Amino acid sequence: MLDIRWIRENADALVLALRKRGQEEAAARSTVEEAIAADEARRTHLTKLQEAQEQRNAASKEIGKALAAGDKEKAERLKAEVAELKGFIQDGEAQERALDNRLRDLLARIPNIPLDDVPVGADENDNVEIRRVGEARQPNWAKEHFEIGEALGLMDFERAAKLSGARFTVLTGTLARLERALGQFMLDLHTTEHGYTEVQPPLLVRDEALFGTGQLPKFDEDLFRTTDGRWMIPTAEVPLTNLVREEILDGEKLPLRYTALTPCFRSEAGSAGRDTRGMLRQHQFYKVELVSITDAESALAEHERMTACAEEVLKRLGLPFRTVVLCTGDMGFGAQKTYDIEVWLPGQKTYREISSCSVCGDFQARRMNARYRAAGDKQARFVHTLNGSGVAVGRALIAVMENYQNEDGSISIPEILQPYMGGLKKIEARG
């Protein structure tokens, strides 16, 4: 959420930022003007309400003086005035809450402002590659992951559909174990070498948590909601970031770095017809998440560090990848800047996203009221938040299957994962 004071003072800059994100000039200006008008109405109302409260307080004091002077008529007149003001104030306080909610809702729907070095563009075609690691091999016999998995008898989409419908997968045997091994390897790397603290968070959260990280109110159609009103997490970013909601942290203890391996649940409402075969786009999938809570001065360096931590996963696995910086039109709602890491899939003959690492500034912190106090400071400041995939486990499984497939249909297990697989070096049909 953006600071309304900043919006008032930088209206044209916000319009420009919204245009960079793909909004038309008229829509962008309407968004900004509506927020400023709502704030003006709220401030005007607050002034009137404060004046009424001052009048009530002054009249209440005069009642005592009138009674002391024996002027009962004046005292009764003042009592009537106080009663009238009391009713006005009660109505005014209700209106104040409505105006607060109106402004909050408008601000909650305005996306974050891209940093100056983010490339301006419309969509993924305008993203800019910044580095490429590893050789993208393309054997002429390469198959896609679902062909490999079904041929091995370890990946079952038909039974998954019978159980749950489209966009689900049943993994069995050594392929299920390989996915588990990937998640364990990632957690071990991030906790023992990268300094992240492992967390096992709830998978069901309240509205406030999703508001804090920016999924609500704008993107509710992308989520699954339970009958009791809780939401299934679309990413562990939600519970991990909200650990500091409504807290004032000790600045000396920043940065806080959290990681979690959780299932994630997404409706994929806007993905009809995309990646309908295989595991690339599922309603349920595992992901290792990285979250950092830091101060403004350290946030950009932390962003580079987090991205390097995610890249290290792919380096250790021996998977070719490239890292791109997203353009303004392709960035997420709450991000100031995002790096996507895309892994090479020889079966698809292309790179596909496996991690997205974003710096959000104080955008989420304002929604969560998450602050810190630096040593010697009386004033608490908003923290800066970052999040990234470290990495998507299901997509890592796909990448291992396609990059380590053999011409006979077997899958060689990356050396780094063999200890997690009981020393197994290859997955074959009998697995």
UniProtKB/Swiss-Prot annotation:
Recorded metabolic or biological pathway in which this protein acts: Aminoacyl-tRNA biosynthesis; selenocysteinyl-tRNA(Sec) biosynthesis; L-seryl-tRNA(Sec) from L-serine and tRNA(Sec): step 1/1
GO terms, molecular function: ATP binding; serine-tRNA ligase activity
EC number of the protein: 6.1.1.11
Protein's GO biological process: selenocysteine biosynthetic process; seryl-tRNA aminoacylation
Record carries keyword ATP-binding: yes
Any one GO CC term of the record: cytoplasm
Residues that bind ATP: R266, S267, E268, E353, I354, S355, S356
Protein biosynthesis recorded as keyword: yes
InterPro entries in the record: aa-tRNA-synt_IIb, aa-tRNA-synth_II, aa-tRNA-synth_II/BPL/LPL, Ser-tRNA-ligase_type_1, Ser-tRNA-synth_1_N, SerRS_1_N_sf, SerRS_core, tRNA-bd_arm
Similarity comment text for this entry: Belongs to the class-II aminoacyl-tRNA synthetase family. Type-1 seryl-tRNA synthetase subfamily.
Protein name per Swiss-Prot or TrEMBL: Serine--tRNA ligase
Gene: serS
